From Swiss-Prot:
It comes from Caenorhabditis elegans. Residues 196-205 are annotated as: G3 motif. The keyword GTP-binding applies. It holds the Pfam family G-alpha. Guanine nucleotide-binding proteins (G proteins) are involved as modulators or transducers in various transmembrane signaling systems. In the 1-cell embryo, probably together with goa-1, controls nuclear rotation and spindle elongation during mitosis. During the first embryonic cell divisons, plays a role in gpr-1/2 cortical localization and in the proper orientation of EMS blastomere mitotic spindle. This is Guanine nucleotide-binding protein alpha-16 subunit. One of its GO terms (cellular component) is cytoplasm. CDD domains: G-alpha. One of its GO terms (biological process) is adenylate cyclase-modulating G protein-coupled receptor signaling pathway. A lipid is attached at residue 2 (N-myristoyl glycine).
Amino acid sequence: MGCIMSQEDEAAKRRSKKIDRLLKEDGENSMRTIKLLLLGAGESGKSTILKQMRIIHDVGYTTEERKVFRGVVYGNIILSLNAIIHAMEQLKISFTTLDHESDARKLLMFSTTGEEDELPEELVVLMKSVWSDSGIQKALERSREYQLNDSAGYYLSQLDRICAPNYIPTQDDILRTRIKTTGIVETQFVYKDRLFLVFDVGGQRSERKKWIHCFEDVTALIFCVALSEYDMVLVEDCQTNRMRESLKLFDSICNNKWFVETSIILFLNKKDLFEEKIVRSPLTHCFPEYTGANNYEEASAYIQQQFEDMNKRTTGEKNQEIYTQFTCATDTNNIRFVFDAVTDIIIRDNLRTCGLY
């Protein structure tokens, strides 16, 4: 372990020195630094993309850092199970056995959040018992009708592995953890001989007033939209359609005076969840006027057009382009491929702004 840790530390030191060198050089050549904002409504996948940047372009997560996420994974599972249990009454779904119903009541009263380093054995037994009930799984399938983390099904289907002694979260486990972003989270990395300063800002309504402090000298912004949330409502008010809220927010961002010269990339995220959902939940939940087929190709193209139509930016007589990518933030290979293409766009637009392209 000592050898592994020293190699990880050495890699981190080398990257840190390279970042320090580029920061020093940046005083002479500002084009070497790319300031990138991640914007979007809450739960659109911004924080997951930021984690991917660390995995792809930095040292990733050491064994010790992965252990720290154990409590977060446990907490996410317990919150998800509690949410499903509470939703069953609202959805009029019954437990299949009285024992499972009794265990569910015990689980709700258990005095832990799960954010400890180990799960009590009694809690593990209750969680597995409750998850085995077909009523719980029916309620999970109807998660659009209440508030539930996207990761719930992923974690619950792997309870045996996650609840095993000495469990250490995998990279995929970490990518799916849900921690509400408050304030501004920054990460730095070097890619294609550029220093990237990436800022993830909270997406909930209460957090958006903090965005203004990031607007100065922005090279590019990535606006994230969760495709799969077209039939869901906001956590904040339980009435407003989430995609309608994202459209309104995107309108205010892409046509903002701060971003007239800024490269804007639209990430239509959670395409995997959208592809599963669209065949059983029509797009008319969000767009009553939609007359196309409820399949991935037509429905995703329609959503893309709705967002791109919001763009009113012009420079002189020329419309400023929006660059759209369909993404799955939990798929490292997809994000690696997409970010490579996006980086070329950002560098090209930055050179053009400086009159060098």
